[in-house]
Structures are given as structure tokens and as C-alpha cells.
């Protein structure tokens, strides 16, 4: 079962990306290095509720 999740920047808190994940294969929160336009650099983005 795939669900939509929102990724938020850990440094500025902006919610920049929406992606999908499979809850059966990845039950924990996902983390990705993505581009943050506010900070103009690549930062760690975490899944938010």
C-alpha cells in the first residue's frame, strides 16, 4: 500500500517535496538529501506527519 508523504527541510522547516512510499517495505520515516530553495543548498529532508 503506497501512501503520499511530505518531506520537510531539517534546517529551515519548509515542506518542499511530496513523494510516495510503501509502508510495508519502509515502516520508518524516510530521510533524503534534497535541494532546499530557501537556503540555496542541499540539506537533509525528513518525512513529516
Swiss-Prot record:
Q: Which GO terms describe its biological process?
A: translation
Which is an annotated Pfam family here? Answer: Ribosomal_L33
Q: Where is the signal peptide?
A: none
- Spell out the molecular function terms from Gene Ontology: structural constituent of ribosome
User: What InterPro entries does this protein's entry cite?
Assistant: Ribosomal_bL33, Ribosomal_bL33_CS, Ribosomal_bL33_sf, Ribosomal_zn-bd
Give Gene Ontology CC terms: cytoplasm; ribonucleoprotein complex; ribosome
Q: Which UniProt keywords apply?
A: Ribonucleoprotein, Ribosomal protein
In the record, the note on similarity to other proteins reads: Belongs to the bacterial ribosomal protein bL33 family.
> What NCBIfam families has UniProt attached to this entry?
PRK00504.1, PRK00595.1, rpmG_bact
Q: Protein name, please?
A: Large ribosomal subunit protein bL33A
Amino acid at each position: 500500500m503506497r501512501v503520499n508523504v511530505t518531506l520537510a527541510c531539517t534546517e529551515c522547516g519548509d515542506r518542499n517535496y511530496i513523494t510516495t512510499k510503501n509502508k510495508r517495505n519502509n515502516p520508518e520515516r524516510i530521510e533524503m538529501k534534497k535541494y532546499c530553495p530557501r537556503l540555496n543548498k542541499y540539506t537533509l529532508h525528513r518525512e513529516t506527519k
